Amino acid sequence: MVLTGEIHHTVIIDGIRIGPYVCLIARTVKHVIGWEWVPYESSQYWSQLIEILPAPTYVVCDGQKGMLLALTTLWPETILQRCRFHAWLNVKTKLTLHPESIAGRQLLALTRELLQVHRKREARIWKHRLKYWYRKHSSYINQRTIYPNPIKGQRKWHYTHYRTRSAYRQLYKLRDDLLRSSYRPHPSLPRNTNFLEGGINSPLRTLIKNHRGMSYEHQMKLIEQYLYSRTEVAKI
């Protein structure tokens, strides 16, 4: 890892799995600035990478739980921009592309609109539309299925439409972050991690695919060489 101590305006972070390991990567829109090998993503392991980097003004990420905890603990003043594309993928996975319910179809359409939000006014409108969706479908997503519990005198329950409810909860958590970051005061602030996904992770996956016969240790060294080649120091 190459550390320069430079304070960056925007940092994009994400993780990529290589066999039994995960490579946590931090970069700007131009350069890789740090990486860390860990067994899995958690607040502890994300902290190992984040704590050695100066806090930026903005950070763009996919909102993984452990990552968020590390960010809010170590970079409390940094403005968080969650990746909307990840939100879209997660909601699409929960609802599918062809939801059976009206609530699901409307929520999927609302998630598509999220990708086109660029300004605070648009964000406020989107937030109000999400609020209206909940008012209209709250009884549906809060519906419970109750079934007998083997323990006498008790009953168990679960949300009947838990996938739709889970998709809504994800968008609900995103709404305030959307307002903070929709008006981008600086052109270097991206709305998603595509700089990392396409510019770094995609070539890494191709690199590993072309060297599948290597041991994981050799693959890791190959990845580190590639990441170093994308640092500012290597490009000087």
Regions found by a protein language model. Name each.
Residues 58-61, 68, 109-236:
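Acidic/histidine-rich catalytic cores and adjacent linkers
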Residues 35, 87, 212-213:
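A generic structural signal for short coil/turn motifs at secondary-structure boundaries
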Residues 22, 70, 94, 205-206:
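Short, function-defining helix-loop hinge/capping sites that tune catalysis or transport
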